[in-house]
A protein has these predicted regions:
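Short pre-catalytic strand/loop immediately N-terminal to key active-site residues, enriched for Gly-Thr
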Residues: 17-29, 170-172
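Short, active-site-adjacent cap segments at secondary-structure transitions
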Residues: 26-27, 112, 179-182
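N-terminal beta-alpha supersecondary unit
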Residues: 1-17, 26, 119
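Active-site catalytic microenvironments for nucleophilic, acid-base chemistry
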Residues: 6, 10, 44-52, 69
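ATP-dependent small-molecule kinase catalytic core of the GHMP/sugar-kinase superfamily
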Residues: 51-171, 184
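Conserved hydrophobic residues forming the short capping helix/wall of the S-adenosyl-L-methionine
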Residues: 4-8, 46, 160-163, 167
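DPxDG-like acidic metal-binding loop motif
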Residues: 29-60, 76
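Glycine-rich beta-strand-to-loop/alpha-helix junction loops that act as flexible
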Residues: 33-34, 174-179
Length: 185
């Protein structure tokens, strides 16, 4: 709904819609489900708008303007490419992953509110140590939200400890603001 309202605000388009959304990504899992839904809605609205009004075209850069206002990681969801995210997920750089990997997602069925995780985050105490960094294809994998997420859901630490012991794992960590963890093989 926020995507639709923001799109209308930008374009002045008052066309009526009924939007049905089937959710398959768990809420509060740190997998960007809500952000992906918002991005998909923006992409659809742009397509419909541009088909209806051939004279006034909404550009991709217009979508990025809206996406940045709606949420820091929504712009990344407008892409369908390998990306390196930093900052709050709002600094996006295309990144080629040279190897083929297999991914394991472990979701402990804990709904972690992004706001609660950020409220438990302290910029002052945030220090990256080498033991917290994981290298993959010359990329450093590091998630600043891991410590506050573990504070709220200690099970995350158990999952990561288990993942670390799996043979042939090349990287592991927590996705987004948690609670889903991943292993890369």
């Amino acid at each position: 709904l926020e995507s639709l309202n923001a799109f209308r605000h930008l374009t002045g388009w008052d066309k009526k819609f009924q939007i049905n959304l089937d959710k398959y990504i768990p809420i509060g899992a740190g997998l960007g489900g809500g952000s992906a839904d918002a991005a998909a809605t923006l992409i659809l609205l742009r397509k419909l708008f541009n088909e209806e009004r051939k004279s006034k075209v909404v550009s991709i850069s217009n979508l990025y303007e809206i996406a940045y206002r709606l949420g820091s990681d929504i712009p990344a969801c407008l892409e369908s490419k390998d990306l390196k995210l930093s900052g709050y997920g709002n600094k996006i750089k295309r990144q080629r992953i040279s190897n083929c990997y297999y991914y394991l997602l472990v979701n402990p069925r804990i709904n972690l509110s992004t706001n609660k995780v950020f409220n438990n985050f302290s910029f002052l105490s945030e220090q990256k140590s080498d033991k917290d960094k994981i290298l993959l294809d010359n990329l450093t994998i590091y998630n600043s939200l891991l410590k506050p997420a573990i504070h709220l859901a200690p099970q995350i630490n158990s999952i990561l400890s288990t993942l670390k012991t799996i043979p042939n794992i090349v990287a592991y960590g927590m996705s987004g603001s948690g609670s889903t963890c991943f292993g890369i093989f």
